[in-house]
Amino acid sequence: MSLHPVILLVLVLCLGWKINTQEGSLPDITIFPNSSLMISQGTFVTVVCSYSDKHDLYNMVRLEKDGSTFMEKSTEPYKTEDEFEIGPVNETITGHYSCIYSKGITWSERSKTLELKVIKENVIQTPAPGPTSDTSWLKTYSIYIFTVVSVIFLLCLSALLFCFLRHRQKKQGLPNNKRQQQRPEERLNLATNGLEMTPDIVADDRLPEDRWTETWTPVAGDLQEVTYIQLDHHSLTQRAVGAVTSQSTDMAESSTYAAIIRH
């Protein structure tokens, strides 16, 4: 009865040694992300576990984080890699990741660790260099359009300024024309008024002897001696009225005779 536990222990030790021997014989596995190692918060990332040969006999693949199981899934036959999609990521996703797969009850060695970091800012990835296109013609065309638009704008501005100045000159010219038309009429009216006013003024400014001679009436039968003197109407008008235009003085130039009665 005491031999059975001993035999059972020997069998377990042999089985464990066989498993360790098989584990070391499995092919290596690699791990890599399909994007940058710097992951923006809120985005998705895919971790790929790749094998060196087709794992038609493998049945399980596991993704570990910091030595603990993070995700695992069954493998598909005749594939050389499996993918684990993680996201939307946050700060808890930051860590060291590795892959391991099984064949039956045997597990392979872990892959090299992959460090993922989650950042808050959006990571701008530089695009792959592609064929460059010549855009010099586009720059030349833009400069040409800008020049044409600038010239048209300056022409419109000049036309508006010219119309404004022309309109202003017309406004200022109308009152001047009216004044020039009114000045000859005013001069004619002044001359007419001066001629109408001069007889009265001359009569008022006569000397007392002249006024006396006009009121003196000769007696019938008396001898009368009549003497005629010439009076300058221009000097009398200028003394009474003041400044009279040259046109009125030329028209009013005449000789006036007065009769003086002597006894």
UniProtKB/Swiss-Prot annotation:
Transmembrane domains' residue ranges: 145-165
Main function: Functions as an inhibitory receptor that plays a constitutive negative regulatory role on cytolytic function of natural killer (NK) cells, B-cells and T-cells. Activation by Tyr phosphorylation results in recruitment and activation of the phosphatases PTPN6 and PTPN11. It also reduces the increase of intracellular calcium evoked by B-cell receptor ligation. May also play its inhibitory role independently of SH2-containing phosphatases. Modulates cytokine production in CD4+ T-cells, down-regulating IL2 and IFNG production while inducing secretion of transforming growth factor beta.
Disulfide pattern: C49-C99
Keyword Glycoprotein in record: yes
Ranges of residues in domain Ig-like C2-type: 27-115
Gene Ontology CC annotations of this record: plasma membrane
Modified residues (Phosphotyrosine): Y228, Y257
Source organism (scientific name): Mus musculus (Mouse)
Gene (name only): Lair1
Protein name according to UniProt: Leukocyte-associated immunoglobulin-like receptor 1
Complex formation: Interacts with SH2 domains of tyrosine-protein phosphatases PTPN6 and PTPN11. The interaction with PTPN6 is constitutive. Interacts with the SH2 domain of CSK. Binds with high affinity to extracellular matrix collagens, the interaction is functionally important.
Description of post-translational modifications: Phosphorylation at Tyr-228 and Tyr-257 activates it. May be phosphorylated by LCK.
Signal peptide interval: 1-21
Subcellular location: Cell membrane
A biological process from GO: cell surface receptor signaling pathway
